[in-house]
Amino acid sequence: MAVFLEAKNAHAVLKRFPRANEFLEELRQGTIERECMEEICSYEEVKEVFENKEKTMEFWKGYPNAVYSVRDPSQSSDAMYVVVPLLGVVLLIVIALFIIWRCQLQKATRHHPSYAQNRYLASRAGHNLPRVMVYRGTVHSQGESSGHREAGNNPQIVMGPSRGGRTTVRLESTLYLPELSLSRLSSATPPPSYEEVTAPQEGSSEEASVSYSDPPPKYEEIVAASPSADK
């Protein structure tokens, strides 16, 4: 059964469908010569494209030789249509990963300060710590009561910041004014000098009469001296 169609209807039926690389064909329109060199073409496909027997035979005579011949160097530019988009996508991915890494690093450094900042904060906190001094003495003040005078012999703790005033605190948690601690320190006797410490001290008459160079007393002398002491 023969079917005859007009030219317009025949072109509609025998239309050419796009290949898998339709996107690249939109960038660079292909020809039958390049397509047949990239793929294996049949005689019917070439005939449908040229729609002319003379042109079809002319192409078909040279086609077997073109399959095994070296391709034109200009056709190597077709690979650029594949390589350039892939490189662009890879570059965008690398830039996005770098931006994400920088954001994460800034968040980490914001929550955890650096080692230098930690040392600065630690040294600054160490300077603000209070100083504690424990001493014994008696508080002398006109406005102090008798109960305070009796408790003056107890150990005292002086606390105060390194840069501010000092306060005096008793072990029984009794607070005194800073002036009392200052008066205590001003009225305290100075320590003895080296000459006073090394000078020979005068003892009692009994200690002076004893000579350590004499021999010890005998047993008879001790026994004779004990009855007289009992009497």
From Swiss-Prot:
Q: Which residues form the propeptide?
A: 1-19
Q: Where in the cell is it found?
A: Membrane
Q: Which residues lie on this side of the membrane: Cytoplasmic?
A: 102-231
Q: How is it modified after translation?
A: Gla residues are produced after subsequent post-translational modifications of glutamate by a vitamin K-dependent gamma-carboxylase.
Q: Output compositional bias ranges, type Polar residues.
A: 201-212
- Keywords from the UniProt entry: Disulfide bond, Gamma-carboxyglutamic acid, Membrane, Transmembrane, Transmembrane helix
- Location of the region described as Disordered in the Swiss-Prot/TrEMBL record: 140-165, 184-231
Classification via Gene3D superfamilies = Coagulation Factor IX (4.10.740.10)
Q: What is this protein called?
A: Transmembrane gamma-carboxyglutamic acid protein 3
Q: Which organism does this sequence originate in?
A: Mus musculus
* Gene responsible for this protein: Prrg3
